């Protein structure tokens, strides 16, 4: 049983659909008080954080929908979301586990990052949607790191940032930046949540169809859908 803390875009088909099933299993174990897996590390980790587990479910579902999988088992997030502080494995170790698991096999939508710059390029629009100041600071920090492997503290910081909701203005700002890579002609739709969802869907379709790697390998391509 495994609930990952990395963005679901790093998971291949088997891992993505497997995590979705295991989240539902965990919810059943905890909510119905079942004994099976009651002492599993993931059960202990999420027992007091069910709303956060349900938010992770929404993140997984957004990635599933981006890849064309149907979803017919919704859950409802009610009340505040408090994420567990503990990890079964820290995020940097989770990258290593995925690298071992995917050796010679189908990878995820987003390639496992070989450098801090690759990691940042994959996360930058998700960060921009949440905190422009952090976006600028992290961009400068990563530029100075060059092609060095992703440092543990950066991997952790990005994983934690993606748990936070974006701001309304940040969402639009990030989507407008992403739209700049795929627009052909015409303006942006007017402000409003429904219009922003339509804008993201247009970005998703064009990025995948045209093979624009910079966007197709971005966490934001599914991450932002959770909040629209």
Provide a role label for each language-model segment.
Residues 1-4:
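Short, charge-rich amphipathic alpha-helices with coiled-coil/heptad character
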Residues 8-9, 22, 47-228:
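Sequence termini and other peripheral, non-core segments
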Residues 7-17:
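Short, charge/polar-rich alpha-helical segments
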